[in-house]
Structure formats: structure tokens, C-alpha cells
UniProtKB/Swiss-Prot annotation:
<feature type="region of interest" description="Disordered">
    <location>
        <begin position="360"/>
        <end position="393"/>
    </location>
</feature>
<dbReference type="InterPro" id="IPR003276">
    <property type="entry name" value="K_chnl_inward-rec_Kir3.3"/>
</dbReference>
<dbReference type="GO" id="GO:0015467">
    <property type="term" value="F:G-protein activated inward rectifier potassium channel activity"/>
</dbReference>
<feature type="site" description="Role in the control of polyamine-mediated channel gating and in the blocking by intracellular magnesium">
    <location>
        <position position="150"/>
    </location>
</feature>
<keyword id="KW-0633">Potassium transport</keyword>
<feature type="transmembrane region" description="Helical; Name=M1">
    <location>
        <begin position="58"/>
        <end position="82"/>
    </location>
</feature>
<feature type="topological domain" description="Extracellular">
    <location>
        <begin position="126"/>
        <end position="134"/>
    </location>
</feature>
<dbReference type="GO" id="GO:0030165">
    <property type="term" value="F:PDZ domain binding"/>
</dbReference>
<dbReference type="GO" id="GO:0034702">
    <property type="term" value="C:monoatomic ion channel complex"/>
</dbReference>
<keyword id="KW-0813">Transport</keyword>
<dbReference type="InterPro" id="IPR013518">
    <property type="entry name" value="K_chnl_inward-rec_Kir_cyto"/>
</dbReference>
<dbReference type="GO" id="GO:0034765">
    <property type="term" value="P:regulation of monoatomic ion transmembrane transport"/>
</dbReference>
<dbReference type="Pfam" id="PF01007">
    <property type="entry name" value="IRK"/>
</dbReference>
<dbReference type="Pfam" id="PF17655">
    <property type="entry name" value="IRK_C"/>
</dbReference>
<feature type="intramembrane region" description="Pore-forming">
    <location>
        <begin position="119"/>
        <end position="125"/>
    </location>
</feature>
<dbReference type="InterPro" id="IPR040445">
    <property type="entry name" value="Kir_TM"/>
</dbReference>
<dbReference type="GO" id="GO:0042734">
    <property type="term" value="C:presynaptic membrane"/>
</dbReference>
Length: 393
């Protein structure tokens, strides 16, 4: 009995935990993986749009400025070459000479004319004439290519600005995961919440267990991924995330934690990655938020503090208590041992039912016998007519 009480005591002595594991996914959702020795870098250029969107902001802005500046310089140089080849620069003071571009007297003027042409801000005293067919062709090319550059760069900037990454920053996960009893079964639980009043549509949750394993053939897999069921079969993984929800993984026979006791779990080396996905209500774009829990961040024998209260006509969420937990009596044995103990208890109760029924029947039989004796006494005392008198009548 003392051992059972110690097993359920939340304040029992905890074994030392393993520390120092390198995270696969950071708490803020960043994947702690760097791509090294990539030889086929040309593949990034085959999808230039995605490459530009994935760049850091300072690099994206630098590329944005360079794209426009280089096109202006390129076409400005061509305008200058046309003027130089036609001899327009040698007849600047000749009023009878018809240049390709009026008042284009040097490279700077050609550069400014290129900017005016590509940005369509309107011509000033520099304007193309109809005596320059090569200039007309170049004007058409610059107008078309300038529109393509505008569409490409503005599209990149728009997609980069409207990316739902910042929306994922308002989706929060509890700082710890907990293990405790729920409906008589051991469950691994964590909490998710949405700080915004605009909701995530079609929200779903997934969980992955990441740890190293070795196959029967001796192959070592350093980051083996195993799915943790969070209600896929029952539909509980589809969330209506209006208020914070506690996500539960029942530790059953299909769970990788089925044979893990408290001591074994705390000595294990693993990482639990949780992934929340959904569509942003305002934009319709898919959003994904991630977090992870190491062994040190899994609290055995704890439960989350309630954050939802009913006020006058509405529910209020107190996010100050979002990460808080409290200790509850929880067995230190594994879920398998707990299930076996419950099965033995159920079997004992099952086989004890017939014996209890037999005892009840015997008690009822003894009571009926005592009642019959009292009736006989009453008959003899004259409370009931004797059978002989009835026969005589």
C-alpha cells in the first residue's frame, strides 16, 4: 500500500533527466536544419520567384532596387549607343539635324530618358522622334520588358508581405506538455490557443515523435518520425479554435509511450513536434504554426490550469494562466501496467459478483425461514385458524 501511495504521489523523488538534446524544431517553429554542400545550386534559379520570396528582407529589397536600376542602366546605355551611332552627339548645336531623341546630349540624359520611358512618368523636353526606327523598336521593347519587371517584382513583394508567417506568430502553444489521467487513462496533453479575434478556418493539429532508433538489420536512423494520434480516427484533430484547447494523445497499445513509465520517460531522449495548420480567415491563405517539446518539457503528474471563465454574457480567456499547470495524483507506472492492473481489478470484481449474489440469496432464504416460523407460532396462538378446524367444518 505504501508503494501504491508513493506511485500516486506527485511529490515523489524524480530521477535525473537527460539534458542537452539538440532541437529539431525550435519553440518558435523554426526548423533547426541547414542545407550544406548543395552542388546543384542552379535548381534555385529554375524557381526564381520562390527563391526571391524566401530571401531575407534585406536581400529582397536589395534585389528589388538592383532589378530596376540595372534595367534603367541597360536601356540607358542602349539609348546612348543609338545616339552615338547615329551621330546625334556630334550635331547637338545643329538645328537642322533630326536626332533620335531630342535633347539627349550624353549618357546621363540617356539614363534619365530610360527612367522616363520605363516608369511611364511622362516625357519632358526629351522625346523620341519619328525619324528613328531603331529607337521606336527599342521603345517598344523597353515598355514590354519594363511591364514584366514591374509585374515580377511587385508580385514578389506582395507575396512576401502577405505571407501568413506573422499570423502564425499569434498561434501559441503551451510551454510544457503534461502527462496525467483523463477518464482513467494516461494521456499526453498540450494546449494551443489563438490570440487574434479573427479565427483560423479548417484548423487541424498533428503531432510527431522524433527520436533515434536502430533497425533489426543494424541501420541507425537518427531522426525517426512516428505519428502520435491526437484524434485522427475520431475527428478530434479538427479544431474549432475560438478559445484555448487542450490536445490529448491517449497512451494506448498503439502509442509509442505504451510501455514508458515515469522513470523511463524521463530517461528517454526524444522530441515531440506539434503542427497546427489552417486557413487565415482574412486572406484564405494556408497558415502553419509549429512548436516542440523535449523530455525536460514533459511534466508527469500535471494538469493545465483553466483559463476560461464565464462573465456577464460572454466567455473570457485569461492568457496569463495559459502556460500554468498544477500537480495531480498520477500513477508512475506505464500505461500498459496501469491497463493490466485495471484488467485484474475488473476480473476480480466480475468473479466476486456471483459469490455476492449467493450470499444475498442465502440471506433472503434465512429471512424467509424465520418468517415461516413466526407464522406457525401465530397459528398456534390462535392468530390464524388451525387447519384441523377448517377440515371439520
Amino acid at each position: 500500500m505504501a508503494q501504491e501511495n508513493a506511485a500516486f504521489s506527485p511529490g515523489s523523488e524524480e530521477p535525473p533527466r537527460r539534458r542537452g538534446r539538440q532541437r529539431y524544431v525550435e519553440k518558435d517553429g523554426r526548423c533547426n536544419v541547414q542545407q550544406g554542400n548543395v552542388r546543384e545550386t542552379y535548381r534555385y534559379l529554375t524557381d526564381l520567384f520562390t527563391t526571391l520570396v524566401d530571401l531575407q528582407w534585406r536581400l529582397s529589397l536589395l534585389f528589388f532596387v538592383l532589378a530596376y536600376a540595372l534595367t534603367w542602366l541597360f536601356f540607358g546605355a542602349i539609348w546612348w549607343l543609338i545616339a552615338y551611332g547615329r551621330g546625334d552627339l556630334e550635331h547637338l548645336e545643329d538645328t537642322a539635324w533630326t536626332p533620335c531623341v531630342n535633347n539627349l546630349n550624353g549618357f546621363v540624359a540617356a539614363f534619365l530618358f530610360s527612367i522616363e520611358t520605363e516608369t511611364t512618368i511622362g516625357y519632358g523636353h526629351r522625346v523620341i522622334t519619328d525619324q528613328c526606327p531603331e529607337g521606336i523598336v527599342l521603345l517598344l521593347l523597353q515598355a514590354i520588358l519594363g511591364s514584366m519587371v514591374n509585374a515580377f517584382m511587385v508580385g514578389c513583394m506582395f507575396v512576401k508581405i502577405s505571407q501568413p508567417n506573422k499570423r502564425a506568430a499569434t498561434l501559441v502553444f503551451s510551454s510544457h506538455a503534461v502527462v496525467s489521467l483523463r477518464d482513467g487513462r494516461l494521456c499526453l496533453m498540450f494546449r494551443v490557443g489563438d490570440l487574434r479575434s479573427s479565427h483560423i478556418v479548417e484548423a487541424s493539429i498533428r503531432a510527431k515523435l522524433i527520436r533515434s532508433r536502430q533497425t533489426l538489420e543494424g541501420e541507425f536512423i537518427p531522426l525517426h518520425q512516428t505519428d502520435l494520434s491526437v484524434g485522427f480516427d475520431t475527428g478530434d484533430d479538427r479544431l474549432f479554435l475560438v478559445s484555448p484547447l487542450v490536445i490529448s494523445h491517449e497512451i494506448d497499445a498503439a502509442s509509442p509511450f505504451w510501455e514508458a513509465s515515469r522513470r523511463a520517460l524521463e530517461r528517454d531522449d526524444f522530441e515531440i513536434v506539434v503542427i497546427l495548420e489552417g486557413m487565415v480567415e482574412a486572406t484564405g491563405m494556408t497558415c502553419q504554426a509549429r512548436s516542440s517539446y523535449l523530455v525536460d518539457e514533459v511534466l508527469w503528474g500535471h494538469r493545465f490550469t483553466s483559463v476560461l471563465t464565464l462573465e456577464d454574457g460572454f466567455y473570457e480567456v485569461d492568457y496569463a494562466s495559459f502556460h500554468e499547470t498544477f500537480e495531480v495524483p498520477t500513477p508512475s507506472c506505464s500505461a500498459r501496467e496501469l491497463a493490466e492492473a485495471a484488467a485484474r481489478l475488473d476480473a476480480h470484481l466480475y468473479w466476486s459478483i456471483p459469490s455476492r449474489l449467493d450470499e444475498k440469496v442465502e440471506e433472503e432464504g434465512a429471512g424467509e425461514g424465520a418468517g415461516a416460523g413466526d407464522g406457525a407460532d401465530k397459528e398456534q396462538n390462535g392468530c390464524l385458524p388451525p387447519p384441523e378446524s377448517e377440515s371439520k367444518v
